[in-house]
């Protein structure tokens, strides 16, 4: 009787393990959601509207900023968000010719290449999200990054307006992302310095996955919630 009971327990454990294995195979990060679901905030944004640029040095309010390419970059400071109904940024062109959309996973930074991917972590609650930097700013004292309204919601600081964050530049993910949206960096140093447009046709490799969809796929790879 005891041996029969043990056998039943072992059978249940085996079924549970097999079920867990099948679930993990059925739902890898890139197929947990359909491309249609991941593209719902920008379904027609299948070609990247901006261009790759580093940019020249520039001055704002008497302070000089020096955009630069980098292989490693971390920064800690305060983040704010933009794209509210009254600030007028929604739909406007960004610093690299993209269109700002408050519902997408994007951000503005003073010196990082455009576009690039960064991981932003809210120090107050440890929530993180990976964003595409496609604009310049913020230029208020003690602010190191401006995130979109959607990103502020994910990081849970929309209501308070600002929060302390850590920024981590993701060089490898950036390179893969640029390939996925078919955006090439300028080949010559002169072109990179002058920030001229890439000669790429800028069409996403998968016509069913929007630009924001590609950003969400990187988040899912890192097991970060993107609320598709």
Curated annotation (Swiss-Prot):
Belongs to the RlpA family. GO terms for biological process: cell wall organization; peptidoglycan metabolic process. It holds the Pfam family DPBB_1. Lytic transglycosylase with a strong preference for naked glycan strands that lack stem peptides. Keywords: Cell wall biogenesis/degradation, Lyase, Signal. It comes from Rickettsia felis (strain ATCC VR-1525 / URRWXCal2). Its EC number is 4.2.2.-. This is Endolytic peptidoglycan transglycosylase RlpA. The gene is rlpA. Residues 1-23 form the signal peptide. CDD domains: DPBB_RlpA-like. GO terms for molecular function: lytic endotransglycosylase activity.
């Amino acid at each position: 009787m005891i041996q029969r009971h043990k056998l039943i327990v072992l059978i249940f454990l085996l079924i549970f393990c097999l079920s867990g294995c099948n679930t993990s195979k059925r739902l890898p990060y890139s197929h947990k959601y359909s491309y249609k679901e991941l593209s719902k905030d920008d379904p027609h944004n299948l070609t990247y509207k901006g261009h790759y640029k580093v940019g020249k040095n520039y001055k704002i309010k008497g302070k000089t900023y020096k955009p630069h390419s980098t292989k490693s970059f971390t920064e800690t400071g305060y983040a704010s968000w933009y794209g509210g109904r009254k600030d007028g940024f929604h739909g406007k062109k960004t610093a690299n010719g993209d269109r700002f959309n408050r519902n997408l996973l994007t951000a503005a930074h003073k010196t990082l290449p455009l576009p690039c991917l960064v991981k932003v972590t809210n120090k107050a609650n440890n929530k993180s999200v990976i964003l595409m930097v496609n604009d310049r700013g913020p230029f208020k004292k003690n602010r190191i990054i401006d995130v979109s309204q959607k990103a502020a919601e994910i990081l849970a600081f929309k209501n308070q307006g600002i929060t302390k964050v850590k920024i981590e530049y993701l060089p490898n993910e950036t390179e893969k992302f640029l390939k996925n949206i078919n955006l090439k960096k300028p080949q010559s140093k002169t072109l990179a310095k002058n920030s001229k447009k890439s000669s790429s046709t800028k069409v996403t490799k998968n016509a069913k996955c929007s630009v924001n969809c590609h950003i969400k796929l990187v988040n899912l790879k890192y097991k970060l919630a993107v609320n598709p």
